[in-house]
Amino acid sequence: MQEYLNFLKYIKENGVLKGDRTGTGTRSIFGYQMRFDLQKGFPLVTTKKIHIPSVVHELLWFLSGSTNIKYLNDNNVRIWNEWATVDGELGPIYGKQWRDFNGQGIDQIADVIQMLKTNPNSRRILVSAWNPCVVPSEKISPQENVVKGNSALPPCHAMFQFYVANNKLSCMLTQRSADAFLGVPFNIASYSLLTNMVAQQCNLDVGEFIWSGGDCHIYNNHIEQVNEQLSREPLALPTLKILRKPNSIFDYKYEDFEFENYNHHPAIKAKISV
């Protein structure tokens, strides 16, 4: 995935130093886009190991509409633990907005599937996780925000839109805040997987996944890791195989997915900024 390495290099060479909510500090640019042809392999970063179970389980968790980390923890995925309450609650984050926007019964995922099947030329086939009514305050902790009825964190990947041409399904993600080293490889994999799942449900082939970032940043304590990753040569992309077609987008299981020939360089550890 040379596209991703080019992204890291661009931020490193052109980013401006900025403060941020976490106090860590970043090197930041505004506005960047990457395109991945899903016919040419699954865009899983190979210059470091990506933890596939976390990608898959988190996406299934979003699709379930859950906002409690119990399912994730039961499957040894702990990527949300720092922001949850003692009861495991995260407030009305992604799953809630996808499946029951603003608590008003609007199932955006079901609506998208229906529109793709009945009106694939529509320019309104999109899902928004950004709900101003529940954006948390930066003046109090994530846990305190949850108690007040807000989300623990505002959505970083805020909106995604589907597009059909020549019987191929493409998806474009708009990400307002992009942690280039830790988050973006994960987001690319997650939404590419979702695109494959939606395409299967709608009897479409896959087209492109397009990633569009707003504030794209490398945290100051990730520079050494970024340099290590940039020194590595990308390997051939793996292939995604979906082993069955369930009755609904909501019925997939972890075991339904195989990532064939995922060859990768060793993992690179880095601290997440909370």
From Swiss-Prot:
Q: Mind listing the GO biological process terms from this record? A: dTMP biosynthetic process; dTTP biosynthetic process; methylation
Listed GO cellular component terms? cytosol
Its annotated function is as follows:
Catalyzes the reductive methylation of 2'-deoxyuridine-5'-monophosphate (dUMP) to 2'-deoxythymidine-5'-monophosphate (dTMP) while utilizing 5,10-methylenetetrahydrofolate (mTHF) as the methyl donor and reductant in the reaction, yielding dihydrofolate (DHF) as a by-product. This enzymatic reaction provides an intracellular de novo source of dTMP, an essential precursor for DNA biosynthesis.
Organism placement in taxonomy:
Bacteria, Pseudomonadati, Pseudomonadota, Gammaproteobacteria, Thiotrichales
Assembly: Homodimer.
Q: Which reaction is this enzyme known to catalyze?
A: dUMP + (6R)-5,10-methylene-5,6,7,8-tetrahydrofolate = 7,8-dihydrofolate + dTMP
Question: So which domain of life are we looking at?
Answer: Bacteria
Q: What is its main location?
A: cytoplasm
In the record, what terms sit under GO molecular function? thymidylate synthase activity
Q: Where does (6R)-5,10-methylene-5,6,7,8-tetrahydrofolate bind?
A: 51, 179, 273
**Catalytic EC class:** transferase
- Pathway where it operates: Pyrimidine metabolism; dTTP biosynthesis
Q: Which family does it belong to?
A: Belongs to the thymidylate synthase family. Bacterial-type ThyA subfamily.
Q: Where does dUMP bind?
A: 21, 123-124, 176-179, 187, 217-219
What the entry lists under InterPro entries is as follows: Thymidate_synth/dCMP_Mease, Thymidate_synth/dCMP_Mease_dom, Thymidate_synth/dCMP_Mease_sf, Thymidylate_synthase
Question: Localized where?
Answer: Cytoplasm
The residues annotated as the active site are 156 (nucleophile)
Tell me which Gene3D superfamilies the record gives: Thymidylate synthase/dCMP hydroxymethylase domain
The transmembrane residues are: none
| Organism (species) | Francisella tularensis subsp. tularensis (strain SCHU S4 / Schu 4)
PANTHER family associated with the record: THYMIDYLATE SYNTHASE 1 (PTHR11548:SF1)
What SUPFAM superfamilies does the entry give?
Answer: Thymidylate synthase/dCMP hydroxymethylase (SSF55831)
Protein name per its UniProtKB record: Thymidylate synthase
Keywords noted in UniProt? Cytoplasm, Methyltransferase, Nucleotide biosynthesis, Transferase
Which HAMAP family does this UniProt record tie to the protein?
Thymidy_synth_bact (MF_00008)
* EC number, UniProt record: 2.1.1.45
